[in-house]
A protein has these predicted regions:
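Start-of-domain marker
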Residues: 23-89
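Structural register within alpha-helical repeat arrays
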Residues: 29, 66, 73, 134, ...
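Canonical positions in the second alpha-helix
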Residues: 50, 161, 208-209, 242-243, ...
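Structural marker of alpha-solenoid helical repeat scaffolds
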Residues: 53-55, 164, 212, 246-247, ...
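Residue-level recognition of tetratricopeptide repeat
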Residues: 56-59, 168, 216, 250, ...
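TPR alpha-solenoid repeat register
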Residues: 62, 170-174, 185, 218-219, ...
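Short coil/linker segments at helix-helix boundaries
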Residues: 69-149, 156, 164-184, 330-360
Length: 401
């Protein structure tokens, strides 16, 4: 047993210097490449590989060489652009993005090594000043990638821009209170996440995005659609309500909220919603039509047809409102037919109601010829009861197809 332990100790004592020498050579090679301005991506990759070893994660020298490798890539592209040479703009922005990651990581390492004492931090002030000058590249780079429909990279840059406000290295700059573009950057993370169909990314900075009041209406819509796709009805409705409260003239928030309340048979809430929308925009025929739909469901027929006629006055081509008005009379007629005993009075009432329903249903058919499932049976019944032979024969053949 003793021999085995002794052998292991000897083997380790032989391997450690070899490993250290190999690591030193790798660092030295990377430094030489950076100094010569060649194989910069290779130098960056080798330093990142070293940092994957937990034994190296606190090695400041590796972090600094890594930073120099990335910085040199950034400066190379920047120089090409300055000299108006052919340059890959995306490489400039991505190198800037990686520099932030490297120096923020080094700052964390130094903080831990120095025993959480800011006064002993050797690099923080210098690196913070350097990155502060480049911070705009994260924002502009995000816009650049949005323009290229590269939403993945755009999201990464905007997220890094926002996170600067939380990074200890930038504490002296108080970005949270001094940077007015954080809200807009957050909006773009919502947008990019939505375009990637990534719910987690869409919602990650959604609260911050609401600081951008200019684009708030779009933020609410992307949030609402994301919650709807997640089948999170509670959050979906909450966002819709917030959106409608701020933008009562928006058809998006109104229509989706109305559909929710109507399907839940919350008719009083739906009516109140319609009234708020009408108050906000008296010319809104959508809200008027929606209100007529609720009144029809509540069997408040006189109020319903009154509103339908108002909509028709405003827009004679609004097809569905003719259906609602026609159903006001048709539904009453079918109810009488089911409940009243046969009599002359019953026949007279039926004919009177069917005659009132007729022009609305005919106009609905004219405006919505493909909606046979909605106008077919009502017109068939009306023609039959009003003894309209020619019209009845035509629709009878149509219904049998």
């Amino acid at each position: 047993m003793f021999r085995k332990i002794l052998f292991m100790v000897l083997a380790l004592s032989i391997c450690l210097p070899t490993m250290c020498n190999a690591q030193k050579k790798e660092i030295s090679k990377a430094k030489d490449n950076v100094k010569a301005g060649k194989s910069l991506e290779e130098a960056e990759a080798s330093m990142r590989k070293l940092l994957t070893d937990s034994a190296n994660k606190d090695n400041e020298k590796i972090w600094l060489v890594l930073f120099d490798a990335v910085r040199k890539q950034y400066e190379t592209v920047n120089e090409q652009m300055y000299l108006k040479q052919k340059a890959d703009t995306s490489k400039l922005f991505l190198a800037a993005y990686r520099m932030f990651g490297v120096l923020e990581g080094l700052d964390s390492v130094e903080w831990n090594l120095k025993g959480v004492q800011p006064a002993k931090m050797k690099y923080r002030k210098r690196h913070a000043e350097y990155l502060n000058q480049l911070k705009g590249n994260l924002y502009n780079g995000g816009l650049f990638f949005v323009g290229k429909n590269d939403y993945k990279n755009a999201y990464s840059l905007f997220a890094a821009y926002i996170d600067c406000a939380k990074q200890p290295i930038f504490a002296a700059y108080d970005y949270q209170n001094n940077d007015k573009r954080i809200g807009t950057a957050a909006f773009y993370t919502v947008y990019c996440g939505y375009k990637q169909n990534d719910a987690e990314r869409t919602l990650a900075y959604a609260d911050v995005a609401q600081q951008d009041t200019i684009r708030l209406i779009m933020t609410y819509q992307y949030m609402a659609e994301t919650y709807r796709q997640k089948a999170d009805t509670t959050k979906f409705v909450e966002v819709l309500e917030s959106g409608f409260a701020r933008y009562p003239q928006s058809k998006y928030f109104f229509s989706h909220l109305f559909d929710h309340y109507y399907k839940q048979s919350k008719y009083d809430v739906a009516i109140a919603l319609c009234d708020d929308a009408i108050e906000a925009d008296t010319s809104s025929i959508v809200a008027l039509f929606a209100k007529s739909t609720v009144l029809l469901a509540q069997q408040k027929y006189n109020d319903c047809v009154s509103i339908c006629d108002k909509v028709i006055e405003k827009d004679k081509n609004f097809a569905d409102v003719y259906l609602n008005a026609g159903l006001v009379y048709f539904n009453q007629a079918t109810y009488i037919e089911r409940t009243m005993r046969h009599s002359r009075e019953k026949t007279q009432k039926l004919k009177a109601l069917f005659k009132k329903a007729l022009p609305y249903m005919q106009e609905y058919r004219k405006l919505a010829p493909n909606e046979k499932s909605k106008w077919g049976i009502p017109l068939y019944t009306i023609y039959l009861n009003l003894n309209m032979g020619r019209e009845f024969e035509e629709i009878d053949k149509l219904m049998k197809k």
